[in-house]
Swiss-Prot record:
The protein's name in its UniProt record: Calcium up-regulated protein G
Family the UniProt entry places it in: Belongs to the cup family.
Membrane topology: Peripheral membrane protein
GO terms, biological process: response to cation stress
PANTHER family from the UniProt entry: CALCIUM UP-REGULATED PROTEIN A-RELATED
Superkingdom of this protein's organism: Eukaryota
Keyword field: Cytoplasm, Lectin, Membrane, Repeat
Organism whose genome encodes this protein: Dictyostelium discoideum
Induction annotation: Induced by high levels of extracellular Ca(2+).
C-alpha cells in the first residue's frame, strides 16, 4: 500500500528492496502533486513510495518514471504501481508486462491518472493511495511536472535567480571558514571559492566543499521570531530535520523541519558586497528573493529525459509533396526525407538551409500556403539543428584536445612516480571519477563558462549510464592492470565521445528536445542552464581541464609507489612540513615510498601537486580523489613501540555523502571506534597488541551515521619471523549491504627493519 501524508508528519523512507526491472522501455521522470489541500489548506501533497510531502532532495521517493507503454516505475526502476488484488489500494510490485492493472494513462488536460485494468482513477483515502470510479473530487486531481533540477551527488553552486550583469550570486560560507556556526550569506561567485560550492545528498543535507562534515543548518532566530532565522554551518547530524532541505517546483529551497519556510536573502545583490541569508516565508511562489537554481543544472540531462515530441508530420497532399520536394531539392535528390540527415556527419546543414530558404513553390504543388508552412518549418528545424550540432562540435573539440596527449602524459607521469607500466599490478582507475573531477575544476575555477562544459559533459556521462542501466552493477572501482591502463582510459574516452554523440543524435531526432536545446544556446553565459559558448575562453578552459586530468592520473598512479606515514603528536619526526609533510593537531603525515619510509618523492612531483592548488589536508588525509594507504611509524621511538612491524592499521575511505562510523574488534574486544567524514578517509590510529607468527584476525563493522549497517569484513594480519606483517581482507568475510559497494583494498606490507606497520585502505562507495 502506498501512503500519502503532509510534510509535518512525514518520514523520509526509501524502497526496502532492490530488484531488477525487466522493462527495456524508455522512461521519463515526473512528480505528481495532488490538488487536494487537506485540512490545513496550505501544505501540498505528493505521490510518494512512503509518505507524500513537499518535493525533497531525496527525490527518489517522490520521483516516478513513466514508460512509453504506460508503466509507472519508482525512480530506481525496480518496482511499478499496481492495483492490489482487492481492486482498491495501490501498491508497489515487480513488473508483469501482461498485467493491465500496471498500466496507467496520465491525462494532463483534466489532471487525472487512470488505471487501464479496471478503468478507475488514482485517488486518496485517508492518506492512502487507491483507485476509485470518477467522482469529481479534488482527491482525484493530480498535476504532473518535471522537477527543478537537483544536483544530488554533484558539486555546484546554489545561484540566485536574480542575475546581476555578467556576474551571479550564490549561497556562500562567510570568509570560507571551516568553523561550525559560521554565517551563510550571499556573495558574488568567485573562482576557487570552496565556500560557495555545495553538494545535496540523497537524504537532503547540503554539504559544503570546505570540509567533509560541514553542512547547511538553521541559525539563530531573527529578533526572537519563530518564522525568521539566519543560516549557518554546522556539523552533520543524523536525523536532524533542521539540516535537511528540499527544492520544490518553484525553485525554492525549503527546510524539512519548517516546511513553509524557504531560503532567501535580505538586501540588494550588486549593491552590498555581502547579503545576509535568511530562512523565512516567501511572499509568493514567484518571489525571486527566495528562488535558487542549481548551477550547473545539467539541463541536457533533463531534456533527453523528456517525453518524445515528434516533428510535425506531413503524410499526404501538398504538405507531403512540399516536404519531399524541399528534401530532394536541398540534398540534390539524395533523399526525400531531409530530417533523416540532421544527424549526418558529412552533410552541410548550412547548405541545406540556403537552398530551402531560396526555394520557390513548383507548379506541381497547388497550395502555396502549404508549401510556405512546410518551408518555414524546415528552415526553423535546420537553424535549430545547426546550432545544436555546433554546441556538440565545440564540446567534442575541447574533449579531443584534452585527451590528445593521453599516452605521452601517462608515460611521463609513470616515469616521475617510478611506476612500471608493463607490470600486472592492479590500479584503481575510475574514469568516471576522473571526468567528474575535471568538471568540478571547471565549475570551481571558471564560474562563468565552466558550468557550460560541465553541463554537456556530465549530462553525457549520465546519458551513457542511463543507456546501459540494465547492466549497471553499482559503483565500479575499475581495477585495471598497469599494463592495460592506457587502453582502459582510451576505451573510456571513446565511450564518452560516443555518449555525447548519441545524446546529440537523440536531441536532433526529436522536435521537442531540439527546440529546448536550441533555446539554451542563446541564454546568457551566467545562466545555469546556458549552452551559449560565444565568447568562452577555450584556451583557459583547456588549461584548467588539462591540469585537472593530470591530477586525476596522479591519483590513479600514486598509490602503487607511495603511501602516507603517520606519527602521533608529541613524537619526533624527520619533517613536520614541506613538500612531502603535513601536520595537524593529531600528528604528522609524511609521504614516502611503500618500501622505504625515508625515500621521499622528487620535487618535480610535489610541485605538480602544490603548484596546481592541491590541498595538503585533502591529500594527506586521502580526501575526495586521493586514496593513499596510511602506515603508523614512530621513527626513533621504536624501543617504546617495538611491535609496530607486526601490526596493520586500516583506513576506511568514504566515497558517499553520508558520514560513516567503524569499529575494529578482536575476539569481542573493542579496539577503537572512529567516524569517517563524507568524501574523506579515516585512519585507525589506536595502538593495539598482536600475537606471534601466523594469522591474526580483526573484525571491522562499518555503519552510517544513522547506525544502519554498511559493510562487515575481517582483516587478516599474517606474521612471519623478522618480517613486517602482511595484510589483506580475509577471503569470504566481506558482507556488503544493498546500496553500497566496497572497492578493491590497497594493501601494503609492514617493515621490520624500518619499523613501520602494514597498511590497508578500504574504499566504500554508494551504489544506486
Amino acid at each position: 500500500m502506498i501512503n500519502i501524508e503532509d510534510i509535518s508528519k512525514s518520514s523520509n523512507q526509501s524502497e526496502e528492496k532492490q530488484l531488477k526491472s525487466t522493462s527495456s522501455k524508455p522512461k521519463y521522470s515526473f512528480a505528481a502533486k495532488s490538488l487536494f489541500k487537506g485540512s490545513n489548506n496550505i501544505t501540498p501533497y505528493y505521490l510518494s513510495t512512503s509518505n507524500t510531502f513537499q518535493c525533497v532532495a531525496s527525490e527518489s521517493i517522490q520521483t516516478w518514471l513513466l514508460s512509453d507503454d504506460g508503466h509507472i516505475f519508482t525512480s530506481s526502476g525496480n518496482f511499478v504501481l499496481d492495483v492490489s488484488s482487492g481492486g482498491y489500494f495501490v501498491e508497489l510490485v515487480q513488473l508483469n508486462s501482461n498485467s493491465k492493472t500496471q498500466i496507467w494513462t496520465i491525462d494532463t488536460t483534466n489532471n487525472k491518472i487512470q488505471n487501464q485494468g479496471n478503468g478507475n482513477y488514482l485517488d486518496i483515502d485517508c492518506f492512502n493511495i487507491c483507485v476509485a470510479p470518477l467522482n469529481g473530487n479534488a482527491t482525484q486531481q493530480w498535476t504532473t511536472f518535471r522537477r527543478a533540477p537537483i544536483p544530488t551527488g554533484n558539486w555546484g553552486y546554489f545561484q540566485s535567480k536574480q542575475l546581476n550583469s555578467n556576474n551571479y550570486w550564490g549561497l556562500s560560507v562567510l570568509n570560507n571558514s571551516t568553523s561550525y556556526n559560521t554565517s551563510v550569506v550571499m556573495n558574488k561567485v568567485q573562482a576557487k571559492s570552496k565556500g560557495q560550492i555545495w553538494q545535496m545528498t540523497s537524504d537532503g543535507h547540503i554539504l559544503s566543499r570546505l570540509d567533509g562534515n560541514l553542512v547547511l543548518d538553521i541559525g539563530p532566530s531573527i529578533n526572537g521570531s519563530t518564522t525568521n532565522y539566519y543560516l549557518n554551518t554546522n556539523v552533520y547530524k543524523a536525523n536532524d530535520l533542521m539540516q535537511q532541505w528540499g527544492i520544490n517546483e518553484n525553485n525554492q529551497i525549503f527546510n524539512q523541519y519548517y516546511p513553509n519556510l524557504c531560503i532567501g536573502f535580505v538586501g540588494q545583490l550588486g549593491v552590498d558586497s555581502t547579503v545576509n541569508c535568511v530562512l523565512a516565508q516567501p511572499s509568493s511562489a514567484c518571489d525571486t528573493y527566495f528562488q535558487f537554481i542549481a548551477n550547473p543544472t545539467y539541463s541536457l540531462n533533463q531534456i533527453v529525459g523528456e517525453v518524445p515530441e515528434p516533428f510535425p508530420a506531413y503524410t499526404s497532399g501538398d504538405l507531403l509533396a512540399s516536404y519531399q520536394y524541399l528534401s530532394n531539392d536541398a540534398t540534390s535528390n539524395f533523399t526525400d526525407d531531409i530530417r533523416s540527415l540532421y544527424t549526418g556527419i558529412n552533410v552541410s546543414l548550412q547548405s541545406f538551409l540556403s537552398i530551402v530558404t531560396n526555394a520557390t513553390c513548383p507548379s506541381s504543388i497547388h497550395s502555396t500556403e502549404d508549401f510556405s508552412n512546410v518551408q518555414n518549418q524546415i528552415k526553423t528545424e535546420l537553424i535549430y539543428a545547426i546550432n545544436v550540432r555546433l554546441v556538440f562540435e565545440n564540446y567534442s573539440g575541447f574533449y579531443s584536445k584534452l585527451f590528445s596527449q593521453g599516452s605521452s602524459n601517462l608515460t611521463n607521469l609513470a616515469n616521475l612516480i617510478n611506476v612500471d607500466m608493463s607490470s600486472n599490478q592492479m590500479v584503481n582507475a575510475n574514469y568516471t571519477d576522473a571526468i567528474t573531477s575535471i568538471f568540478y575544476s571547471l565549475i570551481s575555477e571558471i564560474p562563468v563558462g565552466g558550468p557550460i562544459i560541465a553541463n554537456i559533459g556530465q549530462s553525457a556521462v549520465e546519458f551513457g549510464e542511463l543507456m546501459s542501466q540494465s547492466n549497471y552493477q553499482g559503483a565500479s572501482t575499475y581495477q585495471v592492470e598497469l599494463s592495460q591502463l592506457y587502453t582502459h582510459l582510451n576505451t573510456n574516452y571513446e565511450n564518452e565521445m560516443a555518449n555525447a554523440q548519441s545524446m546529440k543524435d537523440t536531441i536532433l531526432q526529436d522536435w521537442g528536445m531540439m527546440s529546448k536545446t536550441y533555446a539554451l544556446c542563446f541564454l546568457p553565459t551566467n545562466d545555469p542552464s546556458s549552452l551559449n559558448m560565444n565568447g568562452l575562453d577555450f584556451d583557459e578552459i583547456s588549461d584548467v581541464a588539462s591540469v585537472a586530468y593530470e591530477i586525476a592520473m596522479i591519483q590513479m598512479l600514486l598509490p602503487t609507489t607511495y603511501q602516507i606515514y603517520f606519527t602521533p603528536a608529541g613524537y619526533w619526526v624527520p619533517y613536520s612540513d614541506g613538500d612531502f609533510a603535513y601536520s595537524d593537531n593529531s600528528g604528522t603525515y609524511i609521504m614516502a615510498t611503500i618500501e622505504y619510509s625515508n625515500s621521499y618523492p622528487p620535487k618535480e612531483l610535489t610541485d605538480k601537486l602544490w603548484n596546481n592548488g592541491v590541498s595538503k589536508q585533502e591529500f594527506f588525509l586521502s580526501a575526495y580523489g586521493w586514496n593513499l594507504a596510511t602506515s603508523l611509524t614512530y621513527y626513533n621511538n621504536t624501543k617504546q613501540h617495538n611491535n609496530i612491524f607486526k601490526l596493520a592499521f586500516p583506513t576506511i575511505k568514504n566515497f558517499t555523502g553520508v558520514p560513516m562510523q567503524f569499529v575494529m574488534t578482536n575476539e569481542g574486544d573493542n579496539l577503537g571506534n572512529f567516524t569517517v567524514k563524507t568524501h574523506f578517509a579515516k585512519f585507525f590510529s589506536t595502538y593495539y597488541s598482536c600475537g606471534e607468527a601466523g594469522h591474526h584476525y580483526f573484525d571491522i563493522a562499518v555503519t552510517d551515521i544513522n547506525k544502519n549497517k554498511v559493510a562487515n569484513f575481517t582483516v587478516d594480519i599474517k606474521l612471519k619471523a623478522l618480517e613486517g606483517s602482511y595484510v589483506s581482507i580475509k577471503t569470504g568475510s566481506l558482507v556488503v549491504q544493498p546500496g553500497y559497494a566496497v572497492g578493491n583494498p590497497i594493501c601494503n606490507q609492514g617493515s621490520y627493519s624500518l619499523m613501520f606497520s602494514a597498511s590497508i585502505l578500504i574504499p566504500i562507495y554508494k551504489s544506486e
